[in-house]
Amino acid sequence: MTHQIAVLPGDGIGPEIVEQAERVLKALDLPLELRQAPVGGAAFDQFEHPLPPATLELAQGSHAVLFGAVGDWKYDTLPREFRPEQAILGLRKALGLFANLRPAILYPELASASSLKPEIVSGLDILIIRELTGDIYFGTPRGVRTAADGAFAGEREGYDTMRYAESEVRRIARIGFESARKRNKKLCSVDKANVLETSQFWRDLVIEVSRDYPDVELSHMYVDNAAMQLVRNPRQFDVIVTGNLFGDILSDEAAMLTGSIGMLPSASLNAAGQGLYEPSHGSAPDIAGQGIANPLATILSAAMLLRYSLNLAPQADRVEAAVRKVLADGLRTADIHEAGTTKVSTSQMGDAVLKALG
């Protein structure tokens, strides 16, 4: 069976890093059909929309999507619906992507690159699972109005709605428990149940779902404490499951524990296992075209694609082992380079991973 992969390089460094991930996928000699399409600012320049119908159709008809990055300062003056970042939101909605998986792994060779002391972060391996479809990002009503009453009656006020449906919480909780079951059987649910009704609802439902997973140790933590504990003692965590807003913030915080966001892959999945795979970093237009971007997060995202959407765990293991090999050999792109290591370009890092694949 041939697996069709939609390849959407995007903007900034997106094309450079996606190119290296494509090379790795092709080197595995698998029945893959890689089909490219424009997205983000690159698509707007051609079609006056960040997510053209043909690109969306390709993504919907593919087994998985390999995504680079979108965004550039030159598009910041566009109406919001035409900005490059709307492409990723449109893809999440159209594909029904509800679970974002972001590993935060500190490779031993990069321990000194972390902003924390090695004795605190050594051995770090956290999986943060973020719900993508609900919460304050998508709740309605929202907008700007004149306050009708209260302490600020008559003033303009901005407002949003934080909401979660029961089915949304239950399905992301199950992803959390299933993931924890495959790892160290520890799941921490992060909320703000001491203040927010939405969070208390979340916590109650997670506890209900936990009864189906008696082998998984469930704990709860308020988001403010979780933010502190990620810096104070990050190794206490194995799998974290949380809502859209909290997950957005905590996953970026966890990323910096690893030394470089250029090392971190991510996967966004729907109920059928179809997924969008992208590096956790942005488009970095300031370094685009210079050949210095780190492609490893995108290559590791390709490994996640093999594992989660194509069920090709052995091939995913090979890619991840190849990345560990190049790091052990002392090869570094500019973002993770330090004294005693060898600085390489984007394409040279890709070459090294291909060589390590054998």
From Swiss-Prot:
Enzyme Commission no: 1.1.1.85
InterPro entries named in the record: IsoCit/isopropylmalate_DH_CS, IsoPropMal-DH-like_dom, Isopropylmalate_DH
Sequence intervals crossing the membrane: none
Cytoplasm found in the keyword field: yes
Residue positions binding NAD(+): G282, S283, A284, P285, D286, I287, A288, G289, Q290, G291, I292, A293, N294
Pfam families: Iso_dh (PF00180)
Molecular function terms from GO: 3-isopropylmalate dehydrogenase activity; magnesium ion binding; NAD binding
Cofactors that this protein relies on: Mg(2+); Mn(2+)
Top EC group: oxidoreductase
Sites annotated Important for catalysis: Y137, K192
UniProt-annotated location(s): Cytoplasm
Binding positions (Mg(2+)): D224, D248, D252
Catalysed reaction equations from the record: (2R,3S)-3-isopropylmalate + NAD(+) = 4-methyl-2-oxopentanoate + CO2 + NADH
Binding site for substrate: R92, R102, R130, D224
GO cellular component: cytosol
Keywords (A to Z) from UniProt: Amino-acid biosynthesis, Branched-chain amino acid biosynthesis, Cytoplasm, Leucine biosynthesis, Magnesium, Manganese, Metal-binding, NAD, Oxidoreductase
UniProt xrefs under SMART domains: Iso_dh
Record SUPFAM superfamilies: Isocitrate/Isopropylmalate dehydrogenase-like
PANTHER family reported for this sequence: 3-ISOPROPYLMALATE DEHYDROGENASE
Primary role: Catalyzes the oxidation of 3-carboxy-2-hydroxy-4-methylpentanoate (3-isopropylmalate) to 3-carboxy-4-methyl-2-oxopentanoate. The product decarboxylates to 4-methyl-2 oxopentanoate.
Assembly behavior: Homodimer.
Family label: Belongs to the isocitrate and isopropylmalate dehydrogenases family. LeuB type 1 subfamily.
The protein's name: 3-isopropylmalate dehydrogenase
